[in-house]
Amino acid sequence: MTRRIFCQKLGKEADALNYSPYPGELGERIYNHISEQAWQAWLSHQTMLINEYRLSLIDPKARQFLEQEMINFLFGTGSEKPAGYTSEKE
C-alpha cells in the first residue's frame, strides 16, 4: 500500500515518496512533507535550471544555488524561471 501524506507543495493529500531523496534534515523534511508528484515537478524544474544557467554540479556554488532553489520551490514562494526562458511546449 502506498504511503499518503499532505503535500505542502500541492496543498493536498497525495502519494508520498518511497525514500528520502536528499541527505540530512532537509531530506527528512522532503520525505515527510513532499509528494512524489511535487518531487517530480522539482526534478523537471531543476533540469531546466541546470541547462539554462549551464550549471556544473561539481561546483559547490552551483549545488548551493540548486539547494536554495529547491527549498524555495518545494516549501517557499516558488523558484523563478531564468529571464527570457520559454518552454518548448510554448
Swiss-Prot record:
InterPro entries assigned to the protein according to its UniProt record, in alphabetical order: Fe_traffick_prot_YggX (IPR007457), Fe_traffick_prot_YggX_sf (IPR036766)
GO biological process terms on file: cellular response to oxidative stress
Biological classification of the source: Bacteria, Pseudomonadati, Pseudomonadota, Gammaproteobacteria, Legionellales
Family membership noted in the UniProt record: Belongs to the Fe(2+)-trafficking protein family.
Reported function: Could be a mediator in iron transactions between iron acquisition and iron-requiring processes, such as synthesis and/or repair of Fe-S clusters in biosynthetic enzymes.
MF-aspect GO terms: iron ion binding
UniProt keyword annotations, A-Z: Iron
Protein name: Probable Fe(2+)-trafficking protein
Segment forming the signal sequence: none
Organism: Coxiella burnetii (strain CbuG_Q212)
GO cellular component terms attached to this protein's record: cytosol
Keyword Iron: yes
